[in-house]
């Protein structure tokens, strides 16, 4: 059975991804930060599945990432964890950087140290393109992997 770890499982995309992977027969480890409030409202389907395990963890904790990846030995790791409010990124740029940029690096450093490396997916936002857009031959606007980055906030980095 394939095993996947989802950082940021309590967000909208994380909850949808956990349901999808469970439907595909995966064992899913959903990682959520410790919180003073119950942040599992988006997980009613996943929480009732025997192949889903909710794990407390944080992308800013390299030792915790190492322990989890070493014990689970996942086939896939998804990083959807983020400080996802643009305005908050201006108010707390260091915290945003620690979660969005260093958090990704922390996961990648652990993966790099593993003998059998899982596939890795890093979620992002169109905010990284800022006001850069490309146009197709019909004049329609789009952004893709060739669009130049032009972040306008700490969140977008």
Language-model features: locations:
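N-terminal Rossmann-like NAD(P)+-binding domain of SDR-like oxidoreductases, especially those catalyzing
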Residues: 1-157
């Amino acid at each position: 059975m394939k095993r996947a770890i989802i950082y940021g499982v309590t967000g909208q995309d994380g909850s949808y991804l956990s349901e999808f992977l469970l439907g595909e027969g995966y064992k899913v480890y959903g990682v959520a930060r410790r919180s003073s409030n119950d942040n599992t409202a988006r997980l009613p389907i996943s929480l009732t599945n025997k192949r889903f395990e909710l794990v407390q963890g944080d992308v800013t904790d390299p030792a915790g990432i190492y322990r989890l990846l070493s014990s689970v030995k996942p086939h896939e790791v998804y990083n959807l964890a983020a400080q996802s409010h643009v305005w908050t990124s201006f108010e707390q740029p260091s915290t945003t950087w620690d979660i969005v940029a260093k958090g990704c690096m922390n996961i990648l450093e652990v993966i790099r140290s593993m003998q059998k490396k899982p596939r890795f997916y890093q979620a992002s936002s169109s905010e990284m393109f800022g006001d850069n857009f490309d146009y197709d031959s019909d004049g329609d606007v789009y952004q893709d992997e060739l669009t130049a980055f032009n972040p306008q906030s700490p969140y977008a980095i």
